[in-house]
A protein has these predicted regions:
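Catalytic-domain carbohydrate-binding cleft regions of carbohydrate-active enzymes
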Residues: 1-192
């Protein structure tokens, strides 16, 4: 009996520009994803922004940015929603995050598995140390995603620098993904 205010789709290859309108009309006011950040040629310039749909409706959008920090290299495009809770991933996720002028916190989702696993003992052992603060590493804090997103959304609403993206969210990295239901794909595109 709980209505979700967050659409959580971390592992999807692209989104129609009609989605913000559909979400708003469904009572959803926050959207979270991660894979769209993988594009290499036309890199998404934002990780926290308002996504404006085809009818002008906008939705608060947050991209997860967890990745390993590799010393001496700039952040990579690939991010994960299956992070390990360790200093390397916390630093990598924070370094990769692009909207530090709006918000100085990042959400790192961690656990073993492909999008459905839970924390392993090593994650929790790292957390016991990282929550106390380690020099040079962002502080770790566990909380519900909904609470985090609501706080960041409020910051974004108050900040004039919060960017807006208009149109579809496209993942060029997976362009040409095949389907066994080509007719459905064609009709979906036409209906958009």
């Amino acid at each position: 009996g709980v209505d979700s205010k967050v659409l959580w789709l971390p592992d999807v290859f692209g989104y129609s520009a009609a989605l913000p309108q559909i979400l708003r009309k469904s009572g959803v006011d926050k959207f979270v994803t991660s894979k769209i950040g993988w594009s290499e040629t036309d890199k998404m310039p934002y990780d926290t922004f308002f996504w404006k749909g085809i009818d002008g409706t906008d939705i608060f959008t947050y991209f997860m940015t967890a990745q390993d920090k590799v010393r001496g290299k700039k952040p990579a495009t690939n991010v994960t929603y299956n992070a390990k809770l360790n200093p390397c991933q916390l630093i990598g996720g924070y370094d990769r995050y692009q909207q530090k002028d709006i918000n100085n916190e990042v959400m790192i989702t961690f656990g073993y598995g492909d999008g459905g696993g839970g924390p392993i003992r090593k994650d929790l052992e790292y957390y016991d140390v990282l929550k106390k603060g380690v020099s040079g590493v962002p502080c770790a804090k566990m909380e519900f995603a909904g609470s985090f997103l609501e706080r960041i959304k409020k910051r974004a609403e108050k900040n004039q620098k919060t960017p807006c993206w208009q149109g579809e969210l496209y993942l060029e990295y997976h362009r040409g993904t095949y389907t066994s239901m080509a007719q459905n794909k064609k009709l979906n595109r036409r209906s958009e």
